[in-house]
From Swiss-Prot:
S-adenosyl-L-methionine binds at residues 18, 20, 45, 66, 91, 112. It is an enzyme of class 2 (transferase). Belongs to the class I-like SAM-binding methyltransferase superfamily. rRNA adenine N(6)-methyltransferase family. RsmA subfamily. GO terms for molecular function: 16S rRNA (adenine(1518)-N(6)/adenine(1519)-N(6))-dimethyltransferase activity; RNA binding. Its EC number is 2.1.1.182. It catalyses: adenosine(1518)/adenosine(1519) in 16S rRNA + 4 S-adenosyl-L-methionine = N(6)-dimethyladenosine(1518)/N(6)-dimethyladenosine(1519) in 16S rRNA + 4 S-adenosyl-L-homocysteine + 4 H(+). Specifically dimethylates two adjacent adenosines (A1518 and A1519) in the loop of a conserved hairpin near the 3'-end of 16S rRNA in the 30S particle. May play a critical role in biogenesis of 30S subunits. This is Ribosomal RNA small subunit methyltransferase A. Keywords: Cytoplasm, Methyltransferase, RNA-binding, rRNA processing, S-adenosyl-L-methionine, Transferase. It holds the Pfam family RrnaAD.
């Protein structure tokens, strides 16, 4: 049997499917997620239910968002899960997660995310950060390094700034390729993202922050002066106390927020 077949389902490359099969890793992830009935528990991409089963067994109801119609059909017919699951067939990138929130209950979101959509999905989920208690995701190890990076490092970029603006970022564990069927060509890791209840650096317009960081990091090797000259002058950088000769990866999240707020105030 092909190593791309697991429990009778053939992994689909276009959906980025790699199914988690290592029970030790599964148990550690479920422990980190800490399922409970006080939150709306939401899984993105349940796949073949490696995380779905142990989480659903610990709670009354689990909401899942799955794109693959074949996998949705399997979940709908699953002997022990079908009565516990609230299944939404569709694309998580387009999904309105706010519809899942109940009065007095925030979401806990988790999933073994398809690596080909993990970054845009993060940006989509940040839009619902105020309604989320925490998130636990299996990601490409490189993405976890980017999420948790410090200024001045190669991994630090637009994703870092936006993630750390919205959330505390904590790597949980590293997962080798052999923990999956089929094994991915890259190492994986689990990360915990905890949205701030009160943001350390409030931004007046998050869209402006997103635009400014995208513009700054479009050309990483150039200076802020070069990349942001249409938005902030040398005199204005001086007013902000930011060295315009620095490169984008040398600027802290707090400084990016200060620049975005400055641009908003100028408009």
């Amino acid at each position: 049997m092909s190593n791309k077949v697991h429990l009778g389902h053939t992994a689909r490359k276009r959906f980025g499917q790699n199914f988690l099969t290592d029970h030790n890793v599964i148990n550690r992830i479920v422990g980190a997620i800490s399922p409970d009935n006080d939150h709306v528990m939401v899984e993105i991409g349940p796949g073949l239910a490696a995380l779905t089963e142990p989480v659903a067994n610990a709670i009354d109801k689990l909401t899942v968002v799955e794109l693959d119609k074949d996998l949705v059909a399997r979940l709908q017919e699953h002997p022990t899960l079908k009565d516990k699951l609230d299944i939404h067939q569709g694309d998580a990138l387009q999904f309105d997660f706010s519809q899942l929130v109940e009065e007095g209950r925030q979401m806990k979101v988790f999933g073994n995310l398809p690596y080909n959509i993990s970054t845009p999905l993060m940006f989509h989920l940040f839009e619902f950060a105020e309604q989320i208690e925490n998130m636990h995701f299996m990601l490409q190890k490189e993405v976890v390094l980017r999420l948790s990076a410090s200024p001045g490092t190669k991994a630090y970029g637009r994703l870092t700034v936006m993630a750390q603006y919205h959330c505390q970022v904590m790597p949980v564990l590293e997962v080798p390729p052999g923990s999956f069927t089929p094994p991915p060509k890259v190492d994986s890791a689990v990360v915990r993202l905890v949205p701030y209840k009160v943001k350390p650096w409030p931004c007046k317009d998050v869209d402006q922050l997103r635009h400014l960081t995208t513009t700054a990091f479009n050309m990483r090797r150039k200076t802020l002066r070069n990349n942001l000259k249409h938005m902030i002058s040398d005199e204005e950088f001086a007013e902000l106390g930011i060295d315009a000769t620095l490169r984008p990866e040398q600027i802290t999240v707090e400084q990016y927020v200060a620049m975005a707020n400055f641009v908003v105030d100028k408009q």
